[in-house]
């Protein structure tokens, strides 16, 4: 008998099994706009455009980085899919867009249907939180490129916004106010530094951390800010939005600012999430490096006119009680200044 694809490490039967398992999971994210099910060559989506004068599609793509390694070590795979959606959708939200649909890509050394189902279940949960549809994806089994139990994730989000409502930060001026939306923890960036800090302090993922374990605390999925931004857009003019990912406030806030405008942040050290204080202690990491790597408890920064601050906080705090004014826009060549109190 001749060589088969299965002999070379690719099991098509497991691929078929995975498709059957995930079909119902994916279907739960579909509304009437989705015209196709799983298994076709492409996903079809018919957006509702009647309320838009000049609709513009907004796209974003990202991954989860080395947080996946943590999921592998804990053998817990049902939350990194939420991270994947969050990393893409939160970027799309920064332009004022409403998320429409999402696609995922999973690459692995050996297809494990139950594990893949957990991953897709997380993606579907992220899509539900984002109010967007999971309309397609790809699972690639690549023995020789990945170890048997290794995998990687990539995602692609598409949203829509009316052209005259695109948020690009160009109208931000001196005196405007920055509002912070709280993060759920480390989110999906800086995990290479986290792992190095754990190794330096000989801290194990199974060690106790407050009311949970170190591993479980670090694995908490990235917050998705669709509800906050959607609610605010209905009532207030948002001038700029920054998703605080790798590089922290220092690298992400400038991406929404016009020239010669910066934000001076006032942050209380007592309000910084304990997980960041622990990482800093484990790795003896300098404070500037912490703020240059992690979100430090701020997952998104929204800029509004000073007259809209109270109304904005009233809206946002119904969803995120920790939302607060965190800074003021000033004329300066320094994009970000952090006052730690």
UniProtKB/Swiss-Prot annotation:
Pathway(s) annotated for this protein in UniProt: Purine metabolism; IMP biosynthesis via de novo pathway; 5-amino-1-(5-phospho-D-ribosyl)imidazole from N(2)-formyl-N(1)-(5-phospho-D-ribosyl)glycinamide: step 2/2
CDD domains: PurM
Organism: Finegoldia magna (strain ATCC 29328 / DSM 20472 / WAL 2508) (Peptostreptococcus magnus)
EC number: 6.3.3.1
Any Pfam family hit: AIRS
GO molecular function annotation: ATP binding; phosphoribosylamine-glycine ligase activity; phosphoribosylformylglycinamidine cyclo-ligase activity
Localization terms from the record: Cytoplasm
Family: Belongs to the AIR synthase family.
Superkingdom classification of source: Bacteria
UniProt keyword ATP-binding present: yes
Major site of localization recorded for this protein: cytoplasm
GO annotation, cellular component aspect: cytosol
Gene: purM
Entry keyword Transcription: no
InterPro entries reported for this sequence: PurM-like_C_dom, PurM-like_C_sf, PurM-like_N, PurM-like_N_sf, PurM_cligase
Listed PANTHER family: TRIFUNCTIONAL PURINE BIOSYNTHETIC PROTEIN ADENOSINE-3, TRIFUNCTIONAL PURINE BIOSYNTHETIC PROTEIN ADENOSINE-3-RELATED
Listed name of the protein: Phosphoribosylformylglycinamidine cyclo-ligase
């Amino acid at each position: 008998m001749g060589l088969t694809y299965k002999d070379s490490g690719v099991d098509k039967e497991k691929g078929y099994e995975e498709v059957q398992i995930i079909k119902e999971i994916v279907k739960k994210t579909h509304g009437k706009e989705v015209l196709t099910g799983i298994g076709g060559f492409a996903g079809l989506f018919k957006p509702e455009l009647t309320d838009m004068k000049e609709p513009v599609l907004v796209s974003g793509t990202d991954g989860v980085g080395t947080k996946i390694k943590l999921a592998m070590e804990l053998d817990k795979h049902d939350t990194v899919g939420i991270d994947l959606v969050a990393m893409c959708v939160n970027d799309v939200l920064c332009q004022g867009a409403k998320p429409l649909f999402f696609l995922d890509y999973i690459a692995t050394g050996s297809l494990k249907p139950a594990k893949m189902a957990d991953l897709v279940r997380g993606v579907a949960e992220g899509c539900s939180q984002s109010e967007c549809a999971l309309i397609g994806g790809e699972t690639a089994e690549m023995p020789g490129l990945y170890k048997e139990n290794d995998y990687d994730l990539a995602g692609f989000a598409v949203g829509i916004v009316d052209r005259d409502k695109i948020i690009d930060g160009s109208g931000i001026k001196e005196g405007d106010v920055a509002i912070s939306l709280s993060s759920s923890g480390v989110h999906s960036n800086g995990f290479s530094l986290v792992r190095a800090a754990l190794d330096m302090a000989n801290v194990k993922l199974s060690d106790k951390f407050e009311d949970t374990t170190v591993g479980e605390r670090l694995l908490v999925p990235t917050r998705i800010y669709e509800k906050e931004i959607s609610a605010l857009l209905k009532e207030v003019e948002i001038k700029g939005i920054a998703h605080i990912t790798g590089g922290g406030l220092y690298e992400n806030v400038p991406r929404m600012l016009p020239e010669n405008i910066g934000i001076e942040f006032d942050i209380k050290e007592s309000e910084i999430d304990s997980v960041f204080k622990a990482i800093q202690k484990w790795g003896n990491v300098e404070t500037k490096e912490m703020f240059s790597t992690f979100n430090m408890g701020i997952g998104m920064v929204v800029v509004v006119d000073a007259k809209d601050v109270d109304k904005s906080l009233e809206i946002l705090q119904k969803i995120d009680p920790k939302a607060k004014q965190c800074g003021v826009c000033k004329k300066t060549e320094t994009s970000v200044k952090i006052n730690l109190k």
